[in-house]
Amino acid sequence: MSSTLHTPAQHASATKGAKERDTYLTADYGWKSWLFTVDHKRIAVLYLISIMVFFLIGGTFALLMRAELMTAKGDLFEAETYNKLFTMHGVVMIFFFLIPSIPAVLGNFLVPIMIGTKDLAFPKINLLSWYIYLVGGGATLYVAITGGLDTGWTFYAPYSSTYANTNVAAAAIAVFITGFSSILTGLNFIVTIHKMRAPGMTWFRMPLFLWAQYATSLIMILGTPVLAITVMLLALERTFHIGIFDPALGGDPVLFQHLFWFYSHPAVYIMILPGMGVISEIVACFSRKRMFGYHFIAFSSLAIAIFGFVVWGHHMFVSGQSAYAGFVFSFLTMLVAIPSAVKVFNWIATLYKGQVSLETPMLYALGFIGLFTIGGVTGLFLAVMGLDRHVHDTYFVVAHFHYVMVGGMVMAFMGGMHFWWSKMFGRKYPEAMGQFAAVVIFVGFNFTFFPQFILGYMGMPRRYHQYNDEFTALNVLSSAGATILGTGFLMTIVYFLWSLKWGQKAPQNQWDAKGLEWEKAQSPPPTFNFEDGERIVVTEDAYAYTYEESHTGSGHEVKK
Amino acid sequence: MSDHAHSTTGLVHHFDDIEQQHEAGTLGMWAFLITEVLFFGGLFGAYAVYRSAYPEAFMRASSHLDVDLGGVNTIVLICSSLTMALSVYAAQKGSKRGIIMGLLGTMFFGAIFLGVKVIEYKDKWDHHLVPGDNFIFEGNPGGPEQLYFALYFAMTGVHAFHMIVGMVIICWMIKKAHRGDFTPGHHPLVENFGLYWHFVDIVWIFLFPLLYLIGAHSGSHT
Ligand SMILES: [Cu+2]
């Protein structure tokens, strides 16, 4: 099965043993071959390394906050420092971890392979997007070092534009820059999925991961430019005091909120849709069944992307938006629950009478389904205007979006990394460790964030470094959970790194899974993904698992 | 990072054939232009909000713009679109000279447009109409008129930035055209850049009436 690639890279490695197969990892050596690569898989690895750096930075900020909140008094940090901690935590985690996590790492790696082509449509633009990301990330770190930012990740005017004493303009520029990396990724995916599918890979044969990436990309190219122009206006207001968000000069701070949330609510779906795509892949594989309701899941991704653009006003129920607007936004927000629930029910129906096995990716997928459901349902609570007045700006909101973002997206990212780890690096992670860490993360997560629902309902406001004594017990519980959660993530990082060198060598198809990346591409794949000269032709639908056909569902073992 | 480009056809390694490559490029450009629409859309949205909140102030402020210069610039930009279209046509016909002439013409009109813009900006600066702490409108500081000028500078500024980027790309394209990189069957850069340039023109077609013409009937402009 060894392949010979006619690339310039081949000569560099021609001295290696003849039996050794060239993979994208070994095709070329040296830092230049990485920093100037146009291979989508290498760019995915570059992204993986960089988002992990930001994940660790953002996670450190979170742990420092939880340390402060161990006690009711503000004894560890000044209020100002605490403000900077939660702001930087939000900015780093959202713009530099969550948004690029699945699209830029797993999406970059998998989209071309899953549709049976050699690369994304615009490989150089793909590399450019990573450099833009680095520049934006560097600018953010510069802000963090030179006094931080204390506006919250939402940059609300007029505090950000007039009163804050931190480096708002630089932070706004950093976000502005980073946005373009996400636009370029989205653009690349859309064109690639439209134009580069292998013969036979029709739209409705595509794995649902691709539908999710496609819907995400639509949001990226439609929403991100609005954020860009918003933070640009903010930077202008901040620097030149042009009055655009300043009520004293006739400007309207609520306009900032409108523009900001026009992007940032859909951005929530940038952060969750790709996760849903990963879960579809994992659930089908570890149930060994065809996906139940394939078309519904595919279209629900698009529906979420579309609905997502018309619900931003639910962030302004208490910002002086008219009650009628609030009513409409409340109603539309509830509609988003429909396509989300369609997905959940279809996953559960896929599990039903499947041959379910509980390897690490599946543990994360099941965790996702449970936690995302809690996060989603509490989102409905918040969509109800009356209830929102009560829990607005409390820990209830914090718990809600962490259930969706961490319980949802991060779980999906972890599940996806375990699922495709052997495909990316050719070695298996230690399975027992993986399962153990998954349980640790699940337990730690719930201890961290479930108490925050109760705290919020009791009235504890978010973004304060001290609180009333009666909230102490639940806060201690939450902080304890955060250490468990952090331990779980560290364990995972350690055994992943360990497995790169000492992990068991993986076969081409570790999970007996369906899909071109498993059936046609080696682990790890060669530079052009498939065997040299092989033209991929797709002849069957996605998820052609045969458990149902060979077995009518009484539940005992079946030879795969 | 080598190009993997096949010198005779221009086919890049990861595409099956030249047609797929062209289609991908065109779709990519359209998707990018949609992004641009949303980018300007944020500004147009802000404009709509503030104009409906302060219609009189916007008219008063607008009457301080020079409609004649704005009108001249509109004609200039339409001419640049024409030369751009001629350049694309020449590319289809395989006339290297035609491509270069069209691009030079586009460059020429683009430069006139930016030159006029500089004159206008300078005039606003001299009359303290640039938003900020030095803003004075008919003897008064601040106020909704300043919002108008903030939007005027933001919108025309972003538009001018797009023109400057376009002109840099034109320089690069002239070099490529000179080298003979464009053939009748393969000149995606010319086609796609044409789309971009027309888009930038169309933005101006919206900006001109929204910014220059709302105060015209008050008759107080110079
Ligand atoms: Cu929202």
Predicted segments with their positions:
Chain B
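...captures the hydrophobic TM-helix bundle architecture rather than a specific catalytic motif
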Residues: M1-T222
